[in-house]
């Protein structure tokens, strides 16, 4: 993703006095001051006593049980996956539109800096942001506005840590603004990176390097990323968030990130207080906020404001929809004879369902893609399953004994979620949670289980049957899903990740082990 060094020299061969000249592109970029106070409040409460350069807290001591989405036993981020290098900063891109993008920088030093940027095809047209002072572990939210649609931009982060210190310049990074209808593009998907005892940081970086090689316009991560619910206290997981910024920052300086919540990410209302996790996620990871480009949740919540938990947008010929089944599920699962309602308590909630219905019914996109950590309800108490789970609960409308009680439990809703997706031409539902690759088909919809990007072993698929997967193409982790969208057809590939020690004549890193196509909706 890094462009030739000769282009970097255009940005960085400047004098010290020129680092912070009068801003000539004031109207084309701004620092998002409105969200900055919330971001500053979202730092780790233990940060003052535990801060290190690079922000990591080492070790993996664990006491007690792990347990579901509730509070678990971690006291520190598990080693070795969370033992990431120190660094002066990391950068994540988010919220790309036809005319803007958000750059979220997390510095680990004090100083002052600026973003310089220009269209790829006219590198001499350099603009820059206002000078920005920064403090260690206080996120910077920089929004570049007034950009050209359907354009690749290059940018660099230039900074000083003292007035007499040399100017530091990042590598040259890039991003692309919204593609128009008819243009081809690539995006990628991963899920369940975990960074727990079964995770390998080496494999994860290998996967992310493979993602970068695909040169996607953006990347979606389908949750179980921060594992907040596995810690004794939510704030103990802060180092986990920083580790993910290190890993995802290895590519997301040039690949905008969209995050979809998972059951372990600390924002399941039924599992207790979500305030710390929501504020921390919002401070460190810039998800879409509803505006003229993005549709989404417009109901503010407590001290957080916009939740940025479900959202939709258009890119080229495709509609993208990200869903959240955790914020509005307010009851915990009951087991055995106390579980009188099955999994009907799992829900998108009225507002999210009505929003989903409207987004689907008003879209004329050729492709419609839905992203969710697991199906709403699933097939069992742990919400496992693909198409075998699709007939049940809010997703499919039936109890596990086959009786249809949808209108009993959802009297204000038109139809179950799966039927809504079928009638509105959704081609693929991307879901995670179950930790392997599975491509299944049901009534014209592909249910694509997304593999882990970071599993520590070259795995097997024995858990597929245990989790209720009885059909389809099933393969083990690790790897990522690559989607190449064009107006005529969309190709979906499973790109495998192998460390050198695991490669042989039959498997090489970045091999494509399975591919299929989906066709556009006919008008």
Which positions does each model-derived feature cover?
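Active-site neighborhood of phospho(di)ester-bond hydrolases with catalytic His/Asp-centered motifs
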Residues: 189-191, 219-224, 257-263, 369-373, ...
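Extended active-site neighborhood of metal-dependent phosphoesterases/phosphodiesterases
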Residues: 144, 152-174, 233-364, 383-408, ...
């Amino acid at each position: 993703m890094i462009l030739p060094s000769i282009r970097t020299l255009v940005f960085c061969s400047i004098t010290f006095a020129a680092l912070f000249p009068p801003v000539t592109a004031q109207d084309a970029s701004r620092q998002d001051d409105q969200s900055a106070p919330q971001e500053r409040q979202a730092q780790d409460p233990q940060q003052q006593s535990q801060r290190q350069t690079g922000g990591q807290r080492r070790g993996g001591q664990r006491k007690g049980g792990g347990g579901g989405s509730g509070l678990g036993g971690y006291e520190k981020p598990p080693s070795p996956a969370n033992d990431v290098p120190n660094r002066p900063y990391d950068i994540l891109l988010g919220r790309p539109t036809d005319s803007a993008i958000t750059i979220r920088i997390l510095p680990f030093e004090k100083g002052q800096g600026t973003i310089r940027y220009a269209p790829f095809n006219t590198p001499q047209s350099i603009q820059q942001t206002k000078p920005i002072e920064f403090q260690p572990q206080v996120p910077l939210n920089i929004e570049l506005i007034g950009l050209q649609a359907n354009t690749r931009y290059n940018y660099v982060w230039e900074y000083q840590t003292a007035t007499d210190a040399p100017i530091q310049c990042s590598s040259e990074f890039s991003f692309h603004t919204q593609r128009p209808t008819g243009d081809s593009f690539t995006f990628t998907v991963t899920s369940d990176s975990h960074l727990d005892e079964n995770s390998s940081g080496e494999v994860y970086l290998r996967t992310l390097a493979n993602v970068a090689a695909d040169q996607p316009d953006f990347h979606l991560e389908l949750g179980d990323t921060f594992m907040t619910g596995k810690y004794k206290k939510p704030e103990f997981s802060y180092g986990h968030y920083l580790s993910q910024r290190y890993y995802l920052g290895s590519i997301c300086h040039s690949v905008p990130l969209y995050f979809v919540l998972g059951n372990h990410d600390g924002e399941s209302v039924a599992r207790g207080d979500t305030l710390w996790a929501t504020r921390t996620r919002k401070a460190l990871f810039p998800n879409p906020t509803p505006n003229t480009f993005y549709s989404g949740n417009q109901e503010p919540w407590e001290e957080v404001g916009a939740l940025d938990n479900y959202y939709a947008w258009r890119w080229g010929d495709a509609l993208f929809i990200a869903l959240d089944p955790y914020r509005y599920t307010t009851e915990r699962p009951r087991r055995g004879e106390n579980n009188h309602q099955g999994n009907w308590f799992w829900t998108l909630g009225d507002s999210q369902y009505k929003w989903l219905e409207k987004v689907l019914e008003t879209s004329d996109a050729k492709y419609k893609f839905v992203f969710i950590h697991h199906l709403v309800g699933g097939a069992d108490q742990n919400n496992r399953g693909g198409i075998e789970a699709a007939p049940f609960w809010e997703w499919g409308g039936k109890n596990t004994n086959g009786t249809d009680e949808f209108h009993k439990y959802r009297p204000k809703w038109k139809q179950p979620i799966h039927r809504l997706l079928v009638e509105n031409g959704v081609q693929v539902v991307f879901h995670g949670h179950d930790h392997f690759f599975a491509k299944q088909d049901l009534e014209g919809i592909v249910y694509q289980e997304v593999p882990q990007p970071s599993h520590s072993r070259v795995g097997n698929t024995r858990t597929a049957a245990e989790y209720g997967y009885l059909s389809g193409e099933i393969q083990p982790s690790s790897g990522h899903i690559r989607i190449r969208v064009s107006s005529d057809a969309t190709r979906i590939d499973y790109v495998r990740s192998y460390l050198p020690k695991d490669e042989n004549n039959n498997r090489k890193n970045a091999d494509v082990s399975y591919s299929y196509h989906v066709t556009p909706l006919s008008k």
